[in-house]
């Protein structure tokens, strides 16, 4: 059975309906177990380099789970035990981009992934 890893592409107004803050994810796809995938998140409307950033995920029928956090300059990262050693969070402050490199995927990684600040 193949692993369906789904990414919901969205623009999230994080500070209310009037806000110009947006986080737009891309890169979701279907992958077989053991394969890799990289998710991207383009930020706009705020000083990206001034915020720690997060990835969270929601498995079908479940609540939100924290995946990983990266500090403002990318020098420190923290991971959920479920993804430690498999996923890598990184950022490109000059491009306002956040990334999640996912490897050794398993059926348990099937989820909608969201970036957040």
From Swiss-Prot:
Region (Complementarity-determining-2): 69-85
A GO BP entry: adaptive immune response
Gene Ontology CC entries for this record: extracellular region; immunoglobulin complex
Ranges in a coiled coil: none
Annotated segments matching region Framework-1: 20-49
Chain segments carrying region Framework-3: 86-117
Name listed for the protein in its UniProt record: Ig heavy chain V region C3
Protein encoded by which gene: C3
């Amino acid at each position: 059975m193949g692993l369906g890893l789904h990414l919901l592409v969205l623009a999230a107004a994080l500070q209310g309906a009037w806000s110009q803050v947006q986080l737009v994810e891309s890169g979701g796809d279907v992958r077989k177990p053991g394969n890799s995938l990289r998710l991207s998140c383009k930020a706009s409307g705020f000083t990206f380099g001034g915020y720690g950033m997060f990835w969270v995920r929601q498995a079908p029928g479940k609540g939100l789970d924290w995946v990983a956090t990266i500090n403002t300059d990318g020098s420190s990262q923290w991971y959920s035990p479920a993804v430690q050693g498999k996923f890598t969070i990184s950022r490109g402050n000059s491009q306002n981009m956040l990334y999640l490199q996912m490897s050794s995927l398993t059926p348990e990684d099937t989820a909608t992934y969201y970036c957040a600040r």
